[in-house]
């Protein structure tokens, strides 16, 4: 008898929740609150807690402390409470359960004190800073004939801002019979965390944009370095869930309107508003699009080509000067002037012709040269090169000589023609 009395305290707590049934648990209303002793299914990432003899599943935007044992969110009853240490598997949850096989282990009923997390929303009571934008009182969804412009994606949910209120795409709806029309349904978002993230610029390059963009912007969360979990999109009762967890999980409360919450996760990376580093980009472009010009190599190459051209022209000019010298010194016309011997014989002995002496006084004075200065092309540039004065003076002398010879030949030919016409 004494042994039986000692066993009573052990039996009574175990069956203390036996008054609850599956039907009574499912009939309980949803509650937006903070639960302790929370555990997570390792496969589905759903979060569960026992409360008042029932098993509750966290849906929508879930915000937890650093150790993830205390979470704030919208809690939905999905069945009877799971006995300790049986986890969220199919055996514990049954047809109304919240998890796939063997997912996770429930902590003891009286766990340690939660470690404060690094969240903007307080996971202990769901409070948030005053003054943030709130959803209008009207909870009715809007139906659109086509996908609206300037929407944005976050955690696989599609959102838009409409007159200061956020709405989330929750699927298509058909109306009418003849014809049947399909509409895109956008349900108002009631998540405080989602509004906080949107209006405080925690969505990188997505909170404010304009234009006519058909494709949604893909947002990246840029809040604090996060110890926060990332809840599954449209989190419901899990893969093993029956009518209790499944139906509540996919609706607008379970994941449609609240499934894309900001504080529920994201990469946690980045800081600030994504300032563009123009100087860094300019240096990168400079390094990629320019090259370090070898000034010495460019000058050497240009000088080599100019020297080659000057040598060729110098050889030709030397030959021409030799021919002209022979003609001027009375050695007879040679080279380029060999064909003019007969004409020269008619007017005298080369440059000593009396005809030239008579007209020498009428020839203009020779021009005076000025001091030479090197010709520099592209000064201060990588492709800079210069032409020295020795080559410039050579060109000037040859060019002047050619002008004189051309003038001489023109005058000579003119008077020769006059003499020939006179003799004929």
Swiss-Prot record:
Please list where the region (Not essential for gene 3 function) is annotated.
Answer: 253-262
Please indicate if the UniProt record lists Transmembrane as a keyword. yes
UniProt-annotated stretches for the region G2 (Gly-rich linker)? 236-274
Annotated region (CT) at: 275-424
Ranges of biased composition (kind: Gly residues)? 86-105, 235-273
Residue numbers spanned by region G1 (Gly-rich linker): 86-104
| Regions that span the bilayer | 398-418
InterPro entries listed in its UniProt record: Attachment_G3P_N (IPR008021), Attachment_G3P_N_sf (IPR036200), Phage_G3P_N2_sf (IPR013834)
Pfam families in UniProt:
Phage_Coat_A
Its membrane topology: Single-pass type I membrane protein
Record SUPFAM superfamilies: N-terminal domains of the minor coat protein g3p
Record-given protein name: Attachment protein G3P
Organism, scientific name: Enterobacteria phage f1
Q: What is the lineage of its organism?
A: Viruses, Monodnaviria, Loebvirae, Hofneiviricota, Faserviricetes
